Amino acid sequence: MAEDLILERCDLQLEVNGRDHRTADLCRERLVLRRGQPFWLTLHFEGRGYEAGVDTLTFNAVTGPDPSEEAGTMARFSLSSAVEGGTWSASAVDQQDSTVSLLLSTPADAPIGLYRLSLEASTGYQGSSFVLGHFILLYNPRCPADAVYMDSDQERQEYVLTQQGFIYQGSAKFINGIPWNFGQFEDGILDICLMLLDTNPKFLKNAGQDCSRRSRPVYVGRVVSAMVNCNDDQGVLQGRWDNNYSDGVSPMSWIGSVDILRRWKDYGCQRVKYGQCWVFAAVACTVLRCLGIPTRVVTNFNSAHDQNSNLLIEYFRNESGEIEGNKSEMIWNFHCWVESWMTRPDLEPGYEGWQALDPTPQEKSEGTYCCGPVPVRAIKEGHLNVKYDAPFVFAEVNADVVNWIRQKDGSLRKSINHLVVGLKISTKSVGRDEREDITHTYKYPEGSEEEREAFVRANHLNKLATKEEAQEETGVAMRIRVGQNMTMGSDFDIFAYITNGTAESHECQLLLCARIVSYNGVLGPVCSTNDLLNLTLDPFSENSIPLHILYEKYGDYLTESNLIKVRGLLIEPAANSYVLAERDIYLENPEIKIRVLGEPKQNRKLIAEVSLKNPLPVPLLGCIFTVEGAGLTKDQKSVEVPDPVEAGEQAKVRVDLLPTEVGLHKLVVNFECDKLKAVKGYRNVIIGPA
């Protein structure tokens, strides 16, 4: 009788499997695999080798605290002649003496997570068990049978493997891309993402069921959407919008997700202070990409927060055009969420592809502060009965704005604007540092028959109010125009551009006002206004009325959003009519310049020289540069400028870098001081092999 088969050791083939599964950055010390794709193991036995027909090798793969075959969290499979796609299987490919090379496969719908792999080796009636090791299983966008399959290699590279990108802010008229370090493959991030799943209330309530459902990206996306905010659970980020961040970090100061996720872990899964929409979205993007789900951050400019799902944002204004009363429904200058790519087997066919998920805590969904996933196609078609949260997302990009302006006699005059909400919906382009406009994926062209049909469906299914017609045109129109030099620290002019398209004169009065505004629409102090101007608009005339805005009036009050709202109200008393025009102005920050000193080689020290010219008429105090970059820095680094920086002078520091990864990387920089906040910059750095 043959002696027992004794395993000496198991080689998990980290390098080969990491390369094949596109997990090399994660496979330095443990095995990380993508489901539905074969992987290699090498078994080294003591004494004699494996003999087919004499020895039986049986494998066990388990995940979660309560594994079961019925739940799909435990699999038992024996060595076969060839690996079988779509199931757990193993095959001996090569044998040299007492060493055997194995190819194993996993199902494309297996639950993701941490697995323990063990071996039962039996000879006759005797046998022994051995733990081969642990591996982490992720979603696989390269596997056609996986729910997250994406057929474009360029898109897979961008939406799963790329660790840096841009998030778009500012206003619809001036879009500003800020660099962000997602860092999904940085040290410890994968473990933190798995910890996040194991901290969610559904896992704590029924761990076995939760682990089983991790086979479905729809489920995991919804869990991540809830766990990135802390409103119902031990989530990652606490939101705050009141510009008081002294006991935490200002949302505008973050430059990457890595520091946030590491803080959450180091704090014992206690909330990190503070986040706003783009921070929530960026952290969700990091987690979902890390787990293997193709994901991108999306910005919607002029985004509606419609609480009662009537597709109307109503503003009640006084005679000067200032908003009064309840401000719970607002138009945000911009709002960010994420889109993830997946099939929707829980819905009828046709809803696969990009799904919107919003981790910013706004409204509850099925009792939890989360939103989505909802198919972007459902939003475009007005299919508001499709899971999850379609009415809320539809309103964000399609609501109408109704202005009620109080007249001198106390009556209210109404106007509707159909064209304000859901503009310039933006994301980073694939493979390029440029913005891609994806508005067409959410909305049909304004005024098209397809748009009308989508609104008919939305109004019918959600029992929404019928759209009302805009007030009758008077032939007088007004727009807010901007001048040149719209930069932080400058004095500048804006203009009320008024046209009379009729053959008659119009006697009008004009009010112009500029106020500080936060990105979520909350108004601050007035920084410029004019007295009531009496105007005579000649037939077919054009008029341009300036309003001067001084740094000394806005500098101490501007929020980190760098936004000023200009409002013009043109009143024609004789016709009892008015024209309201508003525009949000973004003040551009100074440029951060980055020079890389030294030869950019792997594991060779580099120096980054980072500088910024003071654009203000006053000195800058407490200047500090913070830098980070996946593959360039192990941790975030901050360097202070010891002396005040006078007007027109340079703030300059040098930062040591030690690149660990070959290829293209982004060094992301944030600058802060007493007068300038959240100034961002970046530099692409190509690292060559040592």
Swiss-Prot record:
UniProt EC number: 2.3.2.13, 3.4.-.-, 3.5.1.44, 2.3.1.-
Positions contributing to Ca(2+) binding: 398, 400, 436, 446, 451, 542
Post-translational modification: Disulfide bond formation inactivates the calcium-dependent acyltransferase activity. Cys-370 can form disulfide bonds with both Cys-230 and Cys-371: formation of a disulfide bond between Cys-230 and Cys-370 facilitates formation of the disulfide between Cys-370 and Cys-371, which promotes inactivation of the acyltransferase activity. May also form interchain disulfids between Cys-230 and Cys-370. Ca(2+) protects against disulfide bond formation and inactivation. Auto-transglutaminated: Forms covalent cross-links mediated by transglutaminase between Gln-636 and the epsilon-amino group of a lysine residue of itself or HMGB1, forming homopolymers and heteropolymers, respectively.
Residues with N-acetylalanine modification: 2
Superkingdom, taxonomy of origin: Eukaryota
Listed Pfam families: Transglut_C (PF00927), Transglut_core (PF01841), Transglut_N (PF00868)
GO biological processes: cellular response to dopamine; cellular response to serotonin; peptide cross-linking; phospholipase C-activating G protein-coupled receptor signaling pathway; positive regulation of apoptotic process; positive regulation of GTPase activity; positive regulation of small GTPase mediated signal transduction; protein deamination
Gene Ontology CC annotation, any one: cytosol
Site (Important for catalytic activity): 519
Main location: cytoplasm
Statement: the UniProt record of this protein carries the keyword Transcription: no
Sequence position, cross-link Isoglutamyl lysine isopeptide (Gln-Lys) (interchain with K-?): 636
The name this protein goes by in its record: Protein-glutamine gamma-glutamyltransferase 2
Gene from which the chain derives: TGM2
